Amino acid sequence: MSHYGGNPRGNSSHQFGRKDFQQSDSKHIPKITGQPLPNEVQIPFDNMIYETRNPPKFEKQAKFISEYCINYDRKLQLGRMRAKKFHDKLPPNNLSLDLGKGFETFDPKEGDEKIIMLLEWINQMAPEGGRLKKVIHEADVVCWRGLITKICSTIYNKEEGWRIDAIKRKGVIFLCEEKTEQAKNRDLNQTDLDKRMSYWGHKFEQYVTLDDDAEQPDTSSPVTTKEEYAVVFRNDLQTDQRLNPEKRSIGIFYSGEVDCLDRHGNMLELKTQKGELGHGFYKYSKSFKWWLQSSLVNVDHIIVGLRTQEGHVKSLTSLRTREIPQRASWNFRAGFEFLSTIFTYILNCLEKDGDACVIEYRSEMGIHKGIQMRRVPVDEFDFVPNEFLEKFC
């Protein structure tokens, strides 16, 4: 069943301000099909996007392709044999889970792997000399789910900038998010409290999940993010017809991590939230991100640990993904409309193999002037290695 539903327009003006509802910029969006793009383009933002009643640009539920696990040594294994299970015998109330416990021994994943694990999955599934597009189910674009979420949520989270590198190889567009200078500076200036709060979510996962053969969670071992369970999906995103009326849709092949499985083998996401999930929660971009992350990989339920300001989970509650938009002030269709515009610009820019570009949202310039795309030499990017490409015809 689809996760799309609820109020098609939302109630965005109450939370995000009337200044977002200025006259539409759609008349300024160029019809660029068949015309060479300049080396640099400022991508206009259409304010009327918030009011859209159009059908969702993702027309249907995503198609499940595969699943895989990554072990502590960062080796990919096909299947779900290492996926964590949700500890459903944990009482939902009167809990006292200290999310700060073990912070000093935290064992995080190091470095930026870019899209290497996604390429490794493709590599393991592909025969030598085969056709790349066949392995990715004839998709046009390969990326992480997180990149899709980041772009979609921009319209309700304008303070967070992003940069995406894009390259076309073997007829496929590969997308990879790069850290902006803003993000790098934010990391450098993290306080001890910032670091501890970013740890809390990982500790929560340890408290409420267990290995397949265990009866109780192991909460004494160091928390690590080096082990993962992830899924692979494909979906079709309608193009922005103002930009490319000749191509109806863009096939997107993407992967994302999933936190755990329930007793029936269904996927679950785990989140923490300060206080209660009251009306205010549904006004903010956090609820939009939660919904995006889950709906893109067909997760039906989100388990939420309700915590204190000091980082102690007192109770658990469950959200049904498909019901979140019904209570929200945001319009999920607007996020998909924005994604469609960005992806259509990329599609139009990368016409032939070896074409490359950077798309960047500079939040300090504002959403009306800060979305820019520029062509770059192909040798600026190394996130799709030649050794990977050489396997395919």
UniProtKB/Swiss-Prot annotation:
Region entry Disordered, spans: 1-37
InterPro entries: RAI1, RAI1-like_fam
Composition skew (Basic and acidic residues), residue ranges: 17-28
Alphabetical list of Pfam families matching this protein: RAI1
Gene Ontology terms for molecular function: metal ion binding; mRNA 5'-diphosphatase activity; nuclease activity; nucleotide binding; RNA binding; RNA NAD+-cap (NAD+-forming) hydrolase activity
Positions with a binding annotation for Mg(2+) 2: 205, 257, 259
Protein residues bound to Mg(2+) 1: 205, 259, 269-270
Gene Ontology terms describing biological process: NAD-cap decapping; nuclear-transcribed mRNA catabolic process
UniProt keyword terms in alphabetical order: Hydrolase, Magnesium, Metal-binding, Nuclease, Nucleotide-binding, RNA-binding
UniProt keyword Nucleotide-binding, yes or no: yes
Residues that hold substrate according to the record: 74, 113, 144-146, 257, 271, 293
EC number per UniProt: 3.6.1.-
Catalyzed chemical reaction(s): a 5'-end NAD(+)-phospho-ribonucleoside in mRNA + H2O = a 5'-end phospho-ribonucleoside in mRNA + NAD(+) + H(+); a 5'-end (N(7)-methyl 5'-triphosphoguanosine)-ribonucleoside-ribonucleotide in mRNA + H2O = a (N(7)-methyl 5'-triphosphoguanosine)-nucleoside + a 5'-end phospho-ribonucleoside in mRNA + H(+); a 5'-end triphospho-ribonucleoside in mRNA + H2O = a 5'-end phospho-ribonucleoside in mRNA + diphosphate + H(+)
Cofactor(s) essential for the protein: Mg(2+)
A cellular-component GO term for this protein: nucleus
Co-factor binding comment: Binds 2 magnesium ions.
Function: Decapping enzyme for NAD-capped RNAs: specifically hydrolyzes the nicotinamide adenine dinucleotide (NAD) cap from a subset of RNAs by removing the entire NAD moiety from the 5'-end of an NAD-capped RNA. The NAD-cap is present at the 5'-end of some RNAs and snoRNAs. In contrast to the canonical 5'-end N7 methylguanosine (m7G) cap, the NAD cap promotes mRNA decay. Also acts as a non-canonical decapping enzyme that removes the entire cap structure of m7G capped or incompletely capped RNAs and mediates their subsequent degradation.
Protein family per UniProt: Belongs to the DXO/Dom3Z family.
Record's protein name: Decapping nuclease dom-3
Taxon lineage: Eukaryota, Metazoa, Ecdysozoa, Nematoda, Chromadorea
